[in-house]
Amino acid sequence: MGEARILILTASIGSGHTRAAEAIRTALKARPGAAEQQIDVVDFMSREVSIIHYLMKRIYLTMLRFVPNLYDVFFRIAGKKTSGGAVRAAFAWVMMRTMGRIIRTYQPDLVVATHPFPEGAAALWRIRHGEHFPLAALLTDYALHAIWFVHDVDAYFVATEEMADEMAMLGFDRRRIHATGIPIVLSASRLARREARVQAGISEELPTLLLMGGGLGLGDMDATLAALEQVEQRLAILVVAGRNASLEERARARGKHSHHAVYVSGYTHDVPVLMHAADLLITKPGALTISEAFAAGLPLLLHDPIPGPETENAVYATRCGAAVWLHPGERMAPAVEDILAHHLPVMRRAARNCAREEAAQRVAEILTEMLQRK
């Protein structure tokens, strides 16, 4: 067949879509025959790909930061059967020219999208120009949303069997829907807690909290750190500030005056190690972060979800028994104390039961089969 060209299209809106793409690439490269494959990951929303896409991303992120309720309105409109198709088609039409340039550059034998924007644009380009490359879509949340619903996609990868069944009820071919789980990189899947704590630089044997706000450092981390000062028991607190340099600086300054042992890092690839070192993760409910916590058997305390997808993710993780959802008005310190004192063992078991550690490998296997059938 010669060298097979696989194109993975992602979007740097948060870090979850990109992390899922990297997990797929890692799993594909680990398979037999990987030497005969060229695997490219392209950020569809980067400045280098399209200045228009990049500006759309900046508007989106500004909306999330300053007017999240407006995003909630958009999410709900795009999620309706009547209006979702129109929203999806509008984005696909605007982005189709850029998609054509990418397709001509990479000449893919298979395209995988980890975000609905490139998914819709690739599907529209394929129809308009008579292309025949297989197209797969990876949904990166624990609930369905109509903006993903493109009937011309050859394979869907979803997080749960319930999502697959729901798509089938909506008229999608069940044979094309694969409940693989959400792909993650398993760089620390068998790391013992003691070894992880050594790698994380934790010198004291203390109950350990991991604080994350997503790859963009969103979430009120300052308020979280202030609230944790009300926990009387001394803690080790691992703070991951993401790409938010200002937040990282403020967290370091606050840590100098805390009665807890505070360790601060910016964007890091060592999150799996930190998860294995921690007893509890305090975070916004991004689906990739939740999936990584499940794989580490790490209980979660969830707060401040982005209206829409993160709210659905919080519902799922809480329903699984692996998470506690801190709603507005509820105090963080008592919740942390209660979890540490009474619920960790049960929540750890629930997290492990929810884990789909082989998701990336299963996705890679199915993609390889699609290439072989081409």
Where are the regions a protein language model picked out?
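Nucleotide-activated sugar donor-binding and catalytic core shared by glycosyltransferases
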Residues: 1-242, 246-374
